Amino acid sequence: MSQLNDISLVAQVVVFRNTKAFDQLVKKYQSPVRRFFLNLTCGDNDLSDDLAQDTFIKAYTNLASFKNLSNFSTWLYRIAYNVFYDYLRSRKETADLDTREVDTHWNTSQDDVGQQMDVYQALATLKEMERTCITLFYMEDQSIEKIADITGCPAGTVKSHLSRAKEKMAIYLKQNGYDGNN
């Protein structure tokens, strides 16, 4: 039913230029897209907000190209994925991303902040594609097939990235005091 509603909203925007319909799509997907960027940027709130805004601008301007060959969410994540990698290419920060300082401004308890910081630091040890796959699979609950569509990689490659990323994160977290029961 959700996909049908998304298609209806897309049609209203494309055919009637109904901006309120697009506002509904933004409200529905704003948090997941922002969370996706927060994980890819290892907690950089400002950058995540900027990238999310760019994603929705591109989605709006290209909405007529949505052909319903995949879910709207898959199409939107593909745009978000491209926005992020365009940003990396334009800023030539690919090498610097691994050393990015993690943003410490959180509205949660101290224990939650510490755990979130550790997760972001563990994510920072991953290659960009590994980080993308982990974020989409575990944090955005996307299937292997949808991740393959979003990234343009074969499903087997996505599985390999997930496996390597889990292994690297487990090593990092164990070295930093996590024993699997935390």
Where do the PLM segments sit?
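C-terminal edge and immediately downstream basic/flexible tail or linker adjoining helix-turn-helix-like DNA-binding
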Residues: S2-Q3, G43, D149-G152, K166-N182
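Amphipathic, Lys/Arg- and hydrophobic-enriched alpha-helical face
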Residues: V26-N45, N62, L123, K168, ...
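Internal acidic/polar
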Residues: Q3-I7, D86, K92-A124, S143
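A short pre-motif secondary-structure segment
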Residues: C133-F137
